[in-house]
Amino acid sequence: MRLVEIGRFGAPYALKGGLRFRGEPVVLHLERVYVEGHGWRAIEDLYRVGEELVVHLAGVTDRTLAEALVGLRVYAEVADLPPLEEGRYYYFALIGLPVYVEGRQVGEVVDILDAGAQDVLIIRGVGERLRDRAERLVPLQAPYVRVEEGSIHVDPIPGLFD
């Protein structure tokens, strides 16, 4: 079993145990989640209130019980995640992938930054020199970035990986 973080619980919603959910909308497709420190909980109800998602979990029946979960991390089992359409990726699947420029490995994805308008790959370089091992930021949606099976390929960008 492999768990991946999909969000956190925000403030309680109303009086019957609802919790605001801050995170990936993939939660809309799940029947259960793993709650940090509390184990697996079935999702009994899930709905939108404006732009927010509200989750009701099994065993969380009032506001007091919901308050105990505020701020906790929420996880899903990778096998429970729905498949994505072509060209879309779960972030966790990109972390650790090698990055190549013209067939030469220049680094590895160590994190992904949500920069608002687009997501940015944080790539830690590989090489002998300290400069080679520096972290570089590359927009994931840029036309010069291609995600392929098991690797990421970046067209040459003058000065970035020289």
UniProtKB/Swiss-Prot annotation:
It comes from the Bacteria. Residues 86-160 form the PRC barrel domain. It is found in: Cytoplasm. GO terms for biological process: ribosomal small subunit biogenesis; rRNA processing. InterPro entries: PRC-brl_dom, PRC_barrel-like_sf, RimM, RimM_N, RimM_N_sf, Transl_B-barrel_sf. Keywords: Chaperone, Cytoplasm, Ribosome biogenesis, rRNA processing. The isolated N-terminus (residues 1-80) forms a closed, 6-stranded beta barrel; it probably has the same form in full-length protein. The PRC barrel domain binds ribosomal protein uS19. An accessory protein needed during the final step in the assembly of 30S ribosomal subunit, possibly for assembly of the head region. Essential for efficient processing of 16S rRNA. May be needed both before and after RbfA during the maturation of 16S rRNA. It has affinity for free ribosomal 30S subunits but not for 70S ribosomes. This is Ribosome maturation factor RimM.
